[in-house]
């Protein structure tokens, strides 16, 4: 009898019984330990690592959805903030890093929404960017700070450009109104 059939039989018996016995729980623990030990011995081999990496890559490309993206990008940082808030230690660095993450994440969302309206679907790229950002939040704070500073710099350039363009547009509009008024009075 294979592990899979034992697993299925166990769950069938679990749904039939209201209160599973201690022996059935112990059997389930043994079954899970056997499955996990067989998986860890498989991935210790270099060929096993290559096969498991290819399987994960296949799963990544086949099952990447917006739900998974939102789960990764919003649930994990929210969960980290929950743990930081519940701990009694003062971790201002973690607060700052996670808030910086949300700032960068909002820019990723804004840019990707603009590109998706044009017709570029960037879901896989967004998932990869969010995973890299989560890595920088926990392990590479200087990278996160560098990305934040670059975004603030380009935002400043963008806002000044928009401001000057808007003021120039208002000036041209006022000139146009003046010429229309003059020709209307003639």
Curated annotation (Swiss-Prot):
It is a multi-pass membrane protein. It is found in: Membrane. Glycans are attached at residue 34. Disulfide bonds: none annotated. The keyword Repeat does not apply. Its main location: membrane. The chain crosses the membrane at residues 47-67, 114-134, 144-164. GO terms for cellular component: membrane. Keywords: Glycoprotein, Membrane, Transmembrane, Transmembrane helix. This is Uncharacterized protein L606.
């Amino acid at each position: 009898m294979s592990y899979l059939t034992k697993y299925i039989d166990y769950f069938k018996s679990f749904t039939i019984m209201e209160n599973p016995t201690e022996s059935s729980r112990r059997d389930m623990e043994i079954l899970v330990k056997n499955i996990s030990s067989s998986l860890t011995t498989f991935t210790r081999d270099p060929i096993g690592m290559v096969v498991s990496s290819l399987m994960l890559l296949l799963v990544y490309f086949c099952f990447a959805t917006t739900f998974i993206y939102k789960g990764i990008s919003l649930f994990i940082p929210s969960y980290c903030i929950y743990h930081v808030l519940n701990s009694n230690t003062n971790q201002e660095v973690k607060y700052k890093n996670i808030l910086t993450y949300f700032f960068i994440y909002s820019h990723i969302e804004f840019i990707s929404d603009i590109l998706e309206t044009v017709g570029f679907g960037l879901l896989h790229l967004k998932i990869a960017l969010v995973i890299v950002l989560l890595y920088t939040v926990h392990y590479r704070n200087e990278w996160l700070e560098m990305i934040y500073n670059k975004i603030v710099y380009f935002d400043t350039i963008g806002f000044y450009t928009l401001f000057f363009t808007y003021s120039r547009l208002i000036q041209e509009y006022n000139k146009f109104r003046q010429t229309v008024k003059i020709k209307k009075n003639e």
